[in-house]
A protein has these predicted regions:
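Conserved N-lobe loop of protein kinases adjacent to the ATP-binding glycine-rich P-loop
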Residues: 30-38
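Short beta-strand micro-motifs within the conserved protein kinase catalytic domain, predominantly
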Residues: 71-81
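C-terminal lobe helix-coil module of Hanks-type protein kinase domains
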Residues: 158-251
Length: 252
């Protein structure tokens, strides 16, 4: 990265622009010149939505050290303001689902995501925009959840959930069950752009995943039950509840 452009105090340098994924935020491949590692740099502008909230949320995310979360390494609040994160790494969940996953693998992936979000919740952070694009599987087999501390603030989702302190936990919990259903069946329980929708029962709930997932066996009946309870309004209220509902899994 000999042509990288230093920013701020000079510790970080910008090497190349990445495709935009968030409004009014410019993503770059960057370099931490002190630790000699590749990073992702999110450059904010005066037009970035909810700019102050984004910087505050990202600053709290620095304190989350769970390896399953895309780490936020540093936050610069001056001009230019920017956020330094761990690069996204590994294969996206959508690719893995397309190739087919065993029920045990889906249980493990969603369980690991749930535990990671539980760690974030203890810091007052929530994803609120969890999707198949938010989850990756690294080459070493660990999951990586991207966007914590950044996406929700930029999209204004933190503000929408602020009126009810428990609403953010419920949103992430339901999203985890949606990912579980998608991972098992290759169908989305509802409507989502680019994904086929799951068939529904007479009351509008998605059919049990076992009706569509050939990899499920009788021991996976708890997954059917978790889905049914969620669409009956009796589902888990937080990521930690989802993790407990999934029981044990092999994270290797």
């Amino acid at each position: 990265m000999t042509d990288a452009t230093p920013i701020g105090t000079g510790r970080y340098a910008l090497a190349a622009t990445l495709p935009a994924t968030l409004p009014r935020v410019v993503r770059h491949v960057g370099r931490d010149t002190i630790l000699d590692r590749t990073v992702t740099v999110l450059m904010l502008t005066d037009a970035t939505p909810h700019r102050a909230e984004v910087l505050e949320s990202a600053s709290r995310a620095v304190l989350v050290e769970d390896e399953r979360i895309q780490r936020v390494f540093d936050v610069e609040t001056d001009h230019p303001a920017f956020i330094v994160t761990e690069p996204a790494d590994g294969r996206p969940l959508s690719e893995l689902v397309g190739q087919g996953l065993e029920a045990a693998q889906v249980r493990a992936i969603v369980g690991e995501i749930a535990q990671a979000l539980e760690a974030c919740s203890r810091r007052g952070l929530h994803h609120l925009n969890l999707s198949p694009e938010s989850v990756r599987l690294r080459p070493n087999g660990t999951v990586q959840v991207t966007g914590i501390g950044v996406e929700a603030a930029i999209l204004g989702l933190d503000a929408k959930a602020a009126s009810d302190p428990l609403e953010a936990d419920r949103i992430d919990a339901r999203a985890l069950v949606e990912l579980l259903y998608y991972g098992l069946t290759k169908r989305w329980p509802g409507k989502r752009a680019g994904l086929p929708s799951a068939p529904t029962t007479s009351d509008g709930a998605p059919v049990p995943p076992s009706m569509l997932a050939t990899s499920m066996n009788p021991d996976d009946g708890d997954l059917d039950d978790l889905v049914a309870r969620t669409w009956a309004g009796e589902g888990p209220a937080s990521a930690s509840h989802v993790a407990r509902a999934l029981g044990s899994w092999d994270a290797s």
